């Protein structure tokens, strides 16, 4: 059971591991965050102590898992990985915590989805490095305190507002990851191409970067798909022409918007004259979960100025209407 809980998230992304930078100096973008993190890591190494508990937050695909792996690598300690939805019982978390060694890193992805009973176990573990476990049942039940080695909890979330204040306050380091610039994504695409042994010219890398929604995960995924088109058409190195063709075939427009984005924008434009319209109405019309819209569709549309969230609902901007037409 423990093996199913640990490394669940990382195991699902094993094929991506080779594309991830393993050291902070190799990590592209997020310069202010990276600079601060380097100071925190160096200080903890000099003090021979665990890094303070760290909360990483931001939209999906910006490198939260990679940062957790880098922290463990820079500290030269073990990394144990799991995810909030997997930890359904307090005993699940207790089993993981009691197997940690000094200064180890425990990474919990989607930490905002922790069961409240599991979350409460974390409070004493984070503050006092101890667990209070009930042994037995009924009148004979007794509480036993188990002391843990000092460790670092790294939590990752795309929904900072859903994390309870007691849990949020126990993280000594808060790091926000922002969308990447085209220049940063171009470097990431070029590095990924070298790792994958894919030849591409600068214009192709820029084209992929421009359509990647400011997100490295998407950039690397699109690179692989453009590579497939290049192999099929026997084009080497990849150039802007095959890149443009491939991305158009995939339904990715010049700003990186896909069919889901266009459906979202057109629904508001054509049915509500640009808004406002409530998120639940949008979710029902698009047959999507509200969380999916709020986490996967809206962040980038808001970032590029196409959507505004108001008290009355979602409103699309003049720039969005212009793009649709």
Curated annotation (Swiss-Prot):
Mg(2+) binds at residue 65. DNA binds at residues 290, 309, 314. Keywords: ATP-binding, Cytoplasm, DNA damage, DNA recombination, DNA repair, DNA-binding, Hydrolase, Nucleotide-binding. SUPFAM superfamilies: P-loop containing nucleoside triphosphate hydrolases, Winged helix' DNA-binding domain. It is an enzyme of class 3 (hydrolase). It catalyses: ATP + H2O = ADP + phosphate + H(+). GO terms for biological process: DNA recombination; DNA repair. It is found in: Cytoplasm. GO terms for molecular function: ATP binding; ATP hydrolysis activity; four-way junction DNA binding; four-way junction helicase activity. The keyword Cell inner membrane does not apply. Residues 1-180 are annotated as: Large ATPase domain (RuvB-L). InterPro entries: AAA+_ATPase, AAA_lid_4, DNA_helicase_Holl-junc_RuvB, P-loop_NTPase, RuvB-like_N, RuvB_C, WH-like_DNA-bd_sf, WH_DNA-bd_sf. Residues 181-251 are annotated as: Small ATPAse domain (RuvB-S). ATP binds at residues 19-20, 61, 64-66, 127-129, 170, 180, 217. It holds the Pfam family RuvB_C. The RuvA-RuvB-RuvC complex processes Holliday junction (HJ) DNA during genetic recombination and DNA repair, while the RuvA-RuvB complex plays an important role in the rescue of blocked DNA replication forks via replication fork reversal (RFR). RuvA specifically binds to HJ cruciform DNA, conferring on it an open structure. The RuvB hexamer acts as an ATP-dependent pump, pulling dsDNA into and through the RuvAB complex. RuvB forms 2 homohexamers on either side of HJ DNA bound by 1 or 2 RuvA tetramers; 4 subunits per hexamer contact DNA at a time. Has 3 domains, the large (RuvB-L) and small ATPase (RuvB-S) domains and the C-terminal head (RuvB-H) domain. The head domain binds DNA, while the ATPase domains jointly bind ATP, ADP or are empty depending on the state of the subunit in the translocation cycle. During a single DNA translocation step the structure of each domain remains the same, but their relative positions change. Homohexamer. Forms an RuvA(8)-RuvB(12)-Holliday junction (HJ) complex. HJ DNA is sandwiched between 2 RuvA tetramers; dsDNA enters through RuvA and exits via RuvB. An RuvB hexamer assembles on each DNA strand where it exits the tetramer. Each RuvB hexamer is contacted by two RuvA subunits (via domain III) on 2 adjacent RuvB subunits; this complex drives branch migration. In the full resolvosome a probable DNA-RuvA(4)-RuvB(12)-RuvC(2) complex forms which resolves the HJ. PANTHER family: HOLLIDAY JUNCTION BRANCH MIGRATION COMPLEX SUBUNIT RUVB, PTHR42848. This is Holliday junction branch migration complex subunit RuvB.
